[in-house]
Amino acid sequence: MHISKPAGPLPASVPFYRQLYFQVVVAIVLGALLGHFEPAFAESLKPLGDAFIKLVKMIIAPVIFLTIVTGIAGMTHLKTVGRVFGKAMAYFLFFSTLALVVGLVVAHVVQPGAGMNINPADLDQSAVKSYVEKSHDLTLVGFLMDIIPNSLIGAFTGDQVVNGKLTGPNILQVLFVAVLFGVSLALVGERGKPVLNLLEALIAPVFKLVHILMRAAPIGAFGAIAFTIGKYGVESLVNLAWLVGSFYLTSLLFVLVILGLVSRLCGFSVLKLIRYLKAELLLVLGTSSSESALPSLMEKMEKAGCEKSVVGLVVPTGYSFNLDGTNIYMTLAALFIAQATNTELTLGHQIALLAVAMLSSKGAAGVTGAGFITLAATLAVVPEVPVAGMALILGVDRFMSECRSLTNFIGNAVATVVVSRWENALDRDRLKLVLDGGEPPLLAPVGQPGVAPASLR
């Protein structure tokens, strides 16, 4: 458990132009302008965005491993680990299902594909062939087996080779190894204390490295957004603007109404939480990857009063099991294709669609283009909706990717606070102070003597 130290002097106010969120906003605007006016040159800047995401992925595995191991090893009762995990999974299952239902309901109300009268036979199926092929690998058994790495080192380096290169760390495999190691460290008691002390000492330089890497965020966001606008162009949104607009509006309502209500019931404001995470959200927007802000999210949730052990379990797990934005997209896009191709779906078909989407969305953890691939996997199992219809949304999927990532990110932030509250592992005074824009007291490492704040006693 983290202990509050007396607050030291507040840091000097940082000029707005040196704050990360302002720099990312400027980078996104400049990248969009460059992509619009110089598309050919803008497309060549894709490596800037790719390089930044690779830098972040480089540090994700150590952050998750250190946070989880030190958190679990510091718990006095190991049954707490199972209880936290069980509560998190119950939350994920309920809200993932709710997100799927919301997408389904909105598709029926808005009817984004009605009147298009598309003949599936006239569509270019080759455009989505690669996604359909990838979707065949997404099975429940395969997903569960993939959680277990071939070796301890393999979880951090990646066991699979794609196009002659290792895939990189697998979040679920790192989580699996970290939980086992943390439990083992707790079971050996005092003999494991030197190892625990070493790992706790490593946390400070690792998170300092995260801060250093985040300074490159504006460059990564600039390159990623310039490439997107340069390659696809804003014009590609026009024909399918109704679908894109429906998805953005649905995601916004899900965050403000459903997550907002959950937040209110747990004693905090989702709008204040969004403001607190504005720099990370802008980074997600620029890179179209919620993974790019994972280390910062874990650090900020801990700073906001959530216990490190809860943060370490909920956030990485949520990145695979709590994909609210992806779930909304899957049912909304599936019904859009059905409406556009005049495909009638019975209630039974739609229930089957929900069930398959729930499973396939979990099987796409860590897969590039996960939203589109899981949609292909879902449609492949529900044959009533033509898979060829995915060609209709291929051109605008990239623009919906940002919204998926933002909604997923906010959903995991809310989940972390909620599960912490359920587990009595939330310093509510600290959370209120942070969300109101205040500077919280410094946090002492696990095991350092001190007095727990009132809201944790």
UniProtKB/Swiss-Prot annotation:
PROSITE patterns: NA_DICARBOXYL_SYMP_1 (PS00713), NA_DICARBOXYL_SYMP_2 (PS00714). It is found in: Cell inner membrane. The chain crosses the membrane at residues 22-42, 55-75, 90-110, 138-158, 168-188, 209-229, 242-262. Disulfide bonds: none annotated. It holds the Pfam family SDF. Keywords: Cell inner membrane, Cell membrane, Membrane, Symport, Transmembrane, Transmembrane helix, Transport. It is a multi-pass membrane protein. GO terms for cellular component: plasma membrane. GO terms for molecular function: fumarate transmembrane transporter activity; malate:proton symporter activity; succinate transmembrane transporter activity. One of its GO terms (biological process) is L-aspartate transmembrane transport. Responsible for the transport of dicarboxylates such as succinate, fumarate, and malate from the periplasm across the membrane. Belongs to the dicarboxylate/amino acid:cation symporter (DAACS) (TC 2.A.23) family. This is C4-dicarboxylate transport protein. The gene is dctA.
